[in-house]
From Swiss-Prot:
Residues 1-17 have a biased composition (Low complexity). InterPro entries: DUF5451. Residues 1-86, 122-148 are annotated as: Disordered. Residues 134-148 have a biased composition (Polar residues). This is Uncharacterized protein BLLF2. Residues 38-57 have a biased composition (Basic residues). Belongs to the Epstein-Barr virus BLLF2 family. Keywords: Early protein. It comes from Epstein-Barr virus (strain GD1) (HHV-4).
Length: 148
């Protein structure tokens, strides 16, 4: 059996129809229904957008502060009433500068150097790298293939 065909709703009785037609609602002229309590969505006043909640809030930016040059105070500049600044502060600054300049570059495994940060994600899936062979003699430096 076929589903029932939707029919138009029954028209209002003539007295109500006349009252509705006299009220100026051009959008309701076709359906002859009473005006809605809320206007349709496009005519409503838009609500200001709500601030979206973040599932993972943003981390605060980590600002690298510049390293101050060491303060060098000579005894002839100092007046007798002045107290000399503690020397450990300048020593810490000097140590930090030396540490930053004298430190060798950070060691990066070959996987990270070749594949970038994605290599770290793939590292657990790859087989362990073979240790270099100690038993055989050293290959000549111009040979391309390794003895392993």
């Amino acid at each position: 059996m076929c589903p029932p065909v939707r029919q138009r709703p029954a028209q209002a009785p003539p007295a109500k129809r006349q009252a509705l037609e006299t009220v100026p609602h051009p959008q309701n002229r076709g359906r002859l229904m009473s005006p809605k309590a809320r206007p349709p969505k496009m005519q409503r006043r838009p609500r200001p957008p709500v601030a979206k909640r973040r599932r993972f809030p943003r981390s605060p930016q980590q600002v690298e502060r510049p390293i101050l040059p060491p303060v060098e105070s000579t005894p002839q500049d100092m007046e007798p009433g002045q107290v000399q600044s503690p020397p450990q502060i300048t020593a810490v600054i000097q140590l930090r500068q030396e540490r930053d300049t004298m430190r060798p570059p950070i060691y990066l495994p070959a996987l990270l150097a070749n594949c970038g940060p994605a290599g770290l994600l793939r590292a657990h899936r790859l087989p362990q790298p073979k240790p270099p062979c100690q038993s055989r003699q050293r290959p000549s430096p111009d040979s391309q293939t390794s003895p392993c």
